[in-house]
């Protein structure tokens, strides 16, 4: 019977392979690797020393992370290969269900830049979310990539080194030991349990985190145990949820743990003080591997004595096993491609989009790309794959999919020194049919409040026809040369019909028709400022826009380019504006990242907006200020040094340069300079207004969005100002 490789994490892995271990007349040696999440990285260092000591290994048994390391070792991965592999992984990504930003569609990228969390709801979401916070598909797909050739359900005793792993059946609390199959398990409460027959299986660390008894039952006469568990904590150290939960788990299996300790011949206890199951940072991984080596070296005399007990000469070295031929660029010959849970229309599109062809060689990277596309562009809730061997050679590629979530609740929240607090709430519902449709409702609360409804349908993947309506109440202070000039309150109505097409995953093009109504209240002017003669304004406009995006991160990117361009033609009756020719607006923005070193980057940018026509209405005048496009007004362009909104002339061009230094892993120091040209007409751009501004800022890249504080100066305002932002920008 075959079982898909499902959720893996700092969890336990049981894998599949074949070959037969060769028995000998000497005593059999079993290596036992305990669980411990990230602390299990120390097993790699310990295995290096055991190998260098010339100890033959006949059995490997592991729990949790110990089963991941032990499973890979048993199929031929060397400690050196595993050392290199774990160091280059992005563990924060692997231990999540995130889709790589490079594979996300444009809508998902925009959502990831606004919402703190997303919560699925509906029939599908209820059944899929029960039992854990994360499904673990990214680690599952990595494990599939690492074990090509061993995806069939087989006997683990026929691996190059016989292997077993431990899990717990939470139906009855019994320990379940796996010696065959294709299975991955989960950390209780974090990764979703695996259901097998009548069992519900989770991480075996709760019942047997140091499974010496399993190795003995397999035939091991001598046990080398590597233990990366924390010692039991005294009362004064049990002061957090994590420490209390860890203590409870350790206490549950304490009696069996003590018994297994007595059955250990060479005990390698790793010093993991200061580290937890979640310590997956590069520096932590490096330290834990080194501590594993040091702990094993401290038992060198015991290893020498063990070798003598085996009757082996001090110069004896076991014959090396064939190393596993891993390469992320490896290609495999695929005979058949099958799917569980994929719509036929989506299947045809995916095969064409990813260039997946039967009876051809396909790279593992291409397969990984296909799984990401299934979860992004086609919006399946999870996608994993396996590669069972095909009759006559080669492999069959089999994708396992979960249905799309029907509904999602998205929430965003932010605080800043201009608007204090703002809350963004969105509900999106997907309707599956011959033509997929989406209904989205969005509300914003704060000083400026808004409501928006979007309805769209996809006649083909990545092609969308959309209808939208938005109401927004605005209360905006306008400034002139750094001093408040007037306040404007108004109600804004938007109706839109659009067609958008994603030509490639990084490029989106859209065209459409908009209706806009600006319903102004009376303006409040500061003394000495001239008034605008503004009544209700409305527009029918035609627009075309393009968005190109390759940033690796929405905030604090380290590579890539972001570019936007748009053209709008404004009328009040579809053909003219105010009984004369329509006016138009051209807007462009381009920013890139030049990585100078691993920590230092330069971010040049150029952007502008140009109005063409006469008698430009107040609602469409150019505006600048703030640190993000469209902050208060759709046409607003950012300018460091001006924190508020300032109206400018019809032609506005801005150049910007940022110098960014990363400190630690999530802290950033940014120096910014920008220069602006503004004129009544484009041809006068070099002759009229010039402005410059600069700023220095600190940023923290947090799970709740960027936390930023900056000091800024601009010659137009001729004053130093401070700006603070906490959270995603919307």
Stretch-by-stretch model annotation:
Residues 16-18:
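N-terminal signal peptide c-region/cleavage motif recognized by signal peptidases
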Residues 658-691:
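C-terminal hydrophobic structural anchor segments
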Residues 1-7:
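Bacterial N-terminal signal peptides that target proteins for export
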Residues 507, 598-600, 667:
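Secondary-structure transition into beta-strands, especially the periplasmic turns and strand N-termini
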Residues 365, 382-551, 555, 624-638, ...:
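Gram-negative/organellar outer-membrane beta-barrel architecture
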Residues 408-413, 543-547, 551-663:
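C-terminal outer-membrane beta-barrel translocator/porin domains of Gram-negative envelope proteins
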Residues 21-63, 71-372, 376-389, 393-395, ...:
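Patatin-like phospholipase
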């Amino acid at each position: 019977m075959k079982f898909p490789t499902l959720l893996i994490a700092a969890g336990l892995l049981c894998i599949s392979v074949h070959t037969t271990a060769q028995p000998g007349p000497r005593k059999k040696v079993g290596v036992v690797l305990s669980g411990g999440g990230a602390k299990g990285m120390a097993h790699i260092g310990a295995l290096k020393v055991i190998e260098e000591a010339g100890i033959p290994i006949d059995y490997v048994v592991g729990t949790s992370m110990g089963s991941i390391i032990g499973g890979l070792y048993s199929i031929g991965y060397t400690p050196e290969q595993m050392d290199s592999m774990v160091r280059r992984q992005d563990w924060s990504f692997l231990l999540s269900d995130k889709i790589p930003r490079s594979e996300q569609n444009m809508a998902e990228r925009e959502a990831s830049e606004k919402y703190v969390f997303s919560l699925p709801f509906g029939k599908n979401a209820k059944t899929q979310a029960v039992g854990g916070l994360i499904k673990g598909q990214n680690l599952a797909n990595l494990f599939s990539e690492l074990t090509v050739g061993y995806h069939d359900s087989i006997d683990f005793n026929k691996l190059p080194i016989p292997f077993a792993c431990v899990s717990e059946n939470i139906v009855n609390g019994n320990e379940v030991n796996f010696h065959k199959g294709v299975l991955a398990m989960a950390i209780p409460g974090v990764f979703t349990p695996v259901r097998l027959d009548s069992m519900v299986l989770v991480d075996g660390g709760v019942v047997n985190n140091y499974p010496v008894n399993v190795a003995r039952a397999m035939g091991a006469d001598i046990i080398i145990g590597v233990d990366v568990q924390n010692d039991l904590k005294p009362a004064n150290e049990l002061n957090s949820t994590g420490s209390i939960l860890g203590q409870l788990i350790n206490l549950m299996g304490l009696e069996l743990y003590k018994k297994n300790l007595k059955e250990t011949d060479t005990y390698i206890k790793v010093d993991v003080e200061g580290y937890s199951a979640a310590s997956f940072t590069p520096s932590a991984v490096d330290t834990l591997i080194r501590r594993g080596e040091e702990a094993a070296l401290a038992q060198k005399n015991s290893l020498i004595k063990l070798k003598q007990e085996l009757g082996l000469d001090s110069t004896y070295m076991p014959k090396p096993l064939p190393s596993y031929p891993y390469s992320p660029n490896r290609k495999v010959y695929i005979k058949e491609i099958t799917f569980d849970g994929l719509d036929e229309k989506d299947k045809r599109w995916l095969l064409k989009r990813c260039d997946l062809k039967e009876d051809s060689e396909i790279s593992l990277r291409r397969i990984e790309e296909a799984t990401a596309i299934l979860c992004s562009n086609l919006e399946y809730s999870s996608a994993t794959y396996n590669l069972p061997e095909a009759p006559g050679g080669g492999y069959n590629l089999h994708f396992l999919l979960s249905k799309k979530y029907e509904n999602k609740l998205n929430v965003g929240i932010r605080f800043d020194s201009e608007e204090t607090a703002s809350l963004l709430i969105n509900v999106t519902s997907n309707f599956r049919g011959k033509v997929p449709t989406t209904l989205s409702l969005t509300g914003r609360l704060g000083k400026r409040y808004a409501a928006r409804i979007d309805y769209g349908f996809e006649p083909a993947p990545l092609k969308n026809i959309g209808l939208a309506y938005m109401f927004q109440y605005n209360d905006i202070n306008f400034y002139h040369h750094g001093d408040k000039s007037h306040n404007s309150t108004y109600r804004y109505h938007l109706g839109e019909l659009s067609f958008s097409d994603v030509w490639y995953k990084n490029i989106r093009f859209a065209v459409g028709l908009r209706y806009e109504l600006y319903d102004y209240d009376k303006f409040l002017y500061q003394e000495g400022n001239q008034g605008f003669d503004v009544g209700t304004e409305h527009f029918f406009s035609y627009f075309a826009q393009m968005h190109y995006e390759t940033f690796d991160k929405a905030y604090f990117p380290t590579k890539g380019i972001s570019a936007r361009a748009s053209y709008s033609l404004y009328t009040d009756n579809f053909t003219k504006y105010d009984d004369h020719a329509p006016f138009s607006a051209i807007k462009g923005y381009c920013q890139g990242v030049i990585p100078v070193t691993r920590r230092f980057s330069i971010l040049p940018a150029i952007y502008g907006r140009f109005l063409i026509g006469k008698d430009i209405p107040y609602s469409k005048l150019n505006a600048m200020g703030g640190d993000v496009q469209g902050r208060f007004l759709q046409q607003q362009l950012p300018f460091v040094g001006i924190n508020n909104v300032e109206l400018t002339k019809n032609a506005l061009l801005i150049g910007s340069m940022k110098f960014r230094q990363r400190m630690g892993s999530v802290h950033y120091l940014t120096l910014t300079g920008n220069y602006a040209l503004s004129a009544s007409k484009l041809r006068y751009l070099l002759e009229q207004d010039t402005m410059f501004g600069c700023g220095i800022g600190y940023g923290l890249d947090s799970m709740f969005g960027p936390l930023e504080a900056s000091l800024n100066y601009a010659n137009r305002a001729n004053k130093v100002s401070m700006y603070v932002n906490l959270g995603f920008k919307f």
